[in-house]
Amino acid sequence: MIQRMSKLFVRTLREDPADAEVPSHRLLVRAGYIRRVAPGIYSWLPLGYAVLRKIEEIVRQEMLHIGGQEVHFPALIPREIYEASGRWNEYGDTLFRLKDRKGADYLLGPTHEELFTLLVKGEYSSYKDYPVILFQIQTKYRDEARPRAGILRGREFVMKDSYSFDLDDAGLAASYTAHREAYRRIFDRLGLRYRIVSAVSGAMGGSASEEFLAVTEVGEDAFVYCRNCDYAANTEAVEIGVPDRLDPTGQPPPQVLDTPDTPTIDALVDRLNSLDLGRRFTAADTLKNVVLKTKAPGADDWELLVVGVPGDRDVDLKRLAGQLDPIQVEPATAEDLARRPELVRGYIGPQILRRIGVRYLVDPLVVPGSAWVTGANEPDKHMANVVRGRDFEPDGEIGAATIRDGDPCGRCGGRLALAQGIEIGHIFQLGRKYTDAFELDALGPDGRPIRITMGSYGIGVSRAVAAIAEQCHDDAGLIWPRSVSPADVHVVIAGKGEQEKLAEEFAAALDTAGLDVLLDDRVDASAGVKFADAELIGIPSIAVVGRGAARGVVEVRDRGSGERRELALTDAVAELRTLAAGA
């Protein structure tokens, strides 16, 4: 197929959009792939839609390869279905909710576990019907509080979601493995550099969970990997090595210290080292107690939660939220603290929390038997030698402290490294959360009901477009992998007359060879503008018909490496066909 730039619905831009935060957003807009409609909502133009469709087709092929069957569900879902699973409340403000003219409540689907489960329940009843894998590729909706980075975090996006239904946990494990391998093939074909990391399930429910993260500095998902073993996890699920528990026997008793004007850790450490306490102190010797508030799904009121971490670290709110999900968590406000005068900002200690009915959790780094300097629960006072297990006991542990490069691996003791990525896929062993909610059973060979177990597997199809753009670009523009490029060859006519004639012959020969061609036949654009647009648009092979036209020669450029070669027309067709076949 030949697409002509003179007819193509595209306008490239020389200036970056004002709201562009990351390269993919900037380049996809400038190259005419997408256009903004509203925050987090974008239209797909012909070039962008071509890339999106190619990614969809790769995903579809690999899903069919593992026995998946494609379906398509409505985006509009009645409230009752989400209430049955508990997610009407669990999703909170993330759901787009609406009413019809009769006042009935609906939502725009963020995922479709409930509908898949109900469909299978309505159609299948025997153990002989299982296992089954169903999938769809569909637009999803989430009311993101802060949509950003173009199509990386939008309020409307294209997603592949698939679901496996098995008779037992062994079957679920097999379906999970099949999806995991299919995802590896998909992302390999897309040309993405990615990591598979352990994750938490959150509001999705279930047990085992892994994310596929495209590695890029602009990714908003932090993850860690071990330099010594193959362990990798996002920061919500990371397991770091912690010190051994200590014996509190023989520890000195708590000591109240005068610490005026020390509401921060730095000020406290300076004050401690100005006192004659017989040792030097660092922030790691202090216990930082951070006041937060939580709200359970369906609850009307917020409850205070205090989280303790070593003073040389902060509370990682995203890590904490991932483990508390679906419970919402936010920093407590000054108004929240004003309602609890026992909590003295900057001087909060764990000793009174249980007595006043405030839940207290500590990071595992606050090991039993360890001694700390912490607040004395009155202004300008701290306490030294406060020992966990002797002077206070938390209500539980939760991984909440920020992770640092070089922290010990919880698996092998090696050193962890920090990196950033974009979540492009997520796989879950859901278990029976939804089949319990909707009582999805199959009659076994003995006539007894078997509760079906599920897996859930998502790929961000539209997000993958942005992830590829993040990894595959340079200062001049995009550089698409051949597997997803909107065309195989971008033919640039650098002049007029015989150059135009040869370019038409060349494009026709490429079309006959089965290649998709973008022919820049614009007569009102200079050669310089055409070259700049070719680099911006990013088709991997650029063929320039210029001065060599008189000799029947075209210049073939590799958009990625910059390599240029002059080839006779027939040789150029053969070369480009070979390159396209390797996509």
UniProtKB/Swiss-Prot annotation:
Catalytic activity annotation: tRNA(Pro) + L-proline + ATP = L-prolyl-tRNA(Pro) + AMP + diphosphate
Pfam families per UniProt: HGTP_anticodon, tRNA-synt_2b, tRNA_edit
The keyword Protein biosynthesis is assigned to this record: yes
Recorded domain comment: Consists of three domains: the N-terminal catalytic domain, the editing domain and the C-terminal anticodon-binding domain.
Subunit structure: Homodimer.
HAMAP family, per the entry: Pro_tRNA_synth_type1 (MF_01569)
Function comment: Catalyzes the attachment of proline to tRNA(Pro) in a two-step reaction: proline is first activated by ATP to form Pro-AMP and then transferred to the acceptor end of tRNA(Pro). As ProRS can inadvertently accommodate and process non-cognate amino acids such as alanine and cysteine, to avoid such errors it has two additional distinct editing activities against alanine. One activity is designated as 'pretransfer' editing and involves the tRNA(Pro)-independent hydrolysis of activated Ala-AMP.
Protein's recorded name: Proline--tRNA ligase
